[in-house]
């Protein structure tokens, strides 16, 4: 790959619109009759959580963005998908985009010449709300409350307080090749393209686990987390999307090149609609409904040791 991930530079940014469907399923009720017929017992069979074993993707939409080098994507309210292209109109390199729910805005990371910035854009007016200058270029970002967590090109993990614009180190020592970051609860999840690893740490930077599944995941880039803590990762070199369990003990390939897929770069999981957006190198975006289904024997489940 060339230019860090072998990606070209494009100078536009687009938005696409899609219908959002929200499904709600009640728990299953089961009646059990005792053999002596003296009593009836009603049992509520609680629906099991979404797991690596029962996660099922159903493709709902295919979007041709007519662009390549999409470096970030976000699922926004009202069925809007936001895609971030490799360069903006000023010629600065852009990398990622994330949705900020608190003020209905998006944050875009960009930069060049060793300097970077995070630009906050109001979704309704599509006008820039604020631009925050940084002393280093920025890769992937994630939002939790009023804080943006981000990876830097000098391989550090930092946090930006949106209230006072202060910046703090989460991991101050240099880490090799951090690319994208996701957050869920009190955990952060980072991909490392160079070492082919996914790392989970707490909000203070203490490593909880590291996943290195070379058999199934190579060149990890985009990353996102569902409501149950399952971690979805785009494998650029391995041509697939892999889901990793919250305890890192199990993982499974959900999508491969056989699923009309080639070189996935970024993805985003919408926890409110249980939808997964995946974008590949050629600029094709795929929208999936994520549901609980029967375990597919054709999909290999790996147990990590």
PLM regions: where:
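Structural signal for beta-propeller blades
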Residues: 115-118, 156-158, 196-198, 239-242, ...
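Loop/turn-rich, solvent-exposed surfaces of beta-rich toroidal or solenoidal domains
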Residues: 191, 195-200, 208-246
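Short loop/turn segments that connect beta-strands within beta-propeller blades
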Residues: 122-126, 161-165, 202-206, 245-249, ...
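Protein-protein interaction scaffold domains that mediate dimerization/oligomerization
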Residues: 1-60, 74-76, 179, 249, ...
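Short loop/turn segments immediately following the C-termini of beta-strands
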Residues: 111-113, 153-154, 193, 236, ...
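A short beta-strand motif characteristic of beta-propeller blades
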Residues: 58-64, 83-90, 126-133, 165-173, ...
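Blade-level signature of beta-propeller repeat domains, shared across WD40, Kelch, NHL, RCC1
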Residues: 262-305
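Beta-rich, blade/repeat-based domains predominating
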Residues: 67-76, 90-105, 134-152, 173-194, ...
């Amino acid at each position: 790959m060339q230019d860090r991930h072998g990606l070209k530079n494009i100078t536009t940014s687009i938005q696409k619109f899609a219908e959002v469907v929200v499904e709600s399923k009640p728990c299953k009720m089961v009646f059990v009759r005792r053999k002596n017929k003296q009593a009836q017992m009603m049992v509520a069979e609680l629906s099991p959580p979404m797991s690596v074993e029962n996660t099922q993707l159903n493709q709902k939409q295919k979007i041709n963005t007519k662009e390549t080098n999409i470096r970030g994507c976000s699922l926004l309210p009202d069925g809007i998908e936001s895609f971030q292209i490799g360069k903006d109109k000023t010629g600065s390199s852009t990398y990622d985009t994330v949705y900020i729910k608190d003020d209905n805005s998006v944050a875009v990371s960009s930069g060049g010449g060793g300097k970077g910035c995070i630009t906050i854009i109001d979704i309704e007016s599509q006008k820039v709300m604020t631009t925050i200058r940084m002393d280093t270029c920025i890769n992937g970002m994630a939002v939790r409350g009023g804080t943006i967590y981000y990876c830097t090109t000098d391989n550090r993990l930092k946090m930006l307080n949106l209230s006072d614009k202060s910046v703090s180190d989460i991991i101050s020592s240099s880490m090799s090749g951090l690319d994208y970051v996701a957050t869920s609860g009190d955990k952060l999840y980072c991909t490392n393209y160079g070492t082919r690893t996914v790392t989970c740490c707490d909000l203070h930077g203490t490593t909880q686990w590291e996943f290195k599944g070379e058999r199934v995941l190579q060149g990890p880039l985009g990353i996102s987390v569902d409501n149950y803590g399952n971690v979805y990762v785009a494998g650029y070199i391995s041509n697939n999307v892999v889901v990793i369990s919250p305890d890192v003990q199990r993982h499974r390939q959900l999508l491969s090149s056989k699923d009309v897929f080639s070189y996935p770069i970024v993805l985003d999981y919408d926890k409110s609609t249980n939808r997964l957006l995946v974008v590949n190198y050629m600029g094709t975006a795929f929208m999936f409904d994520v549901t609980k289904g029967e375990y597919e024997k054709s999909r290999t489940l790996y147990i990590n040791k």
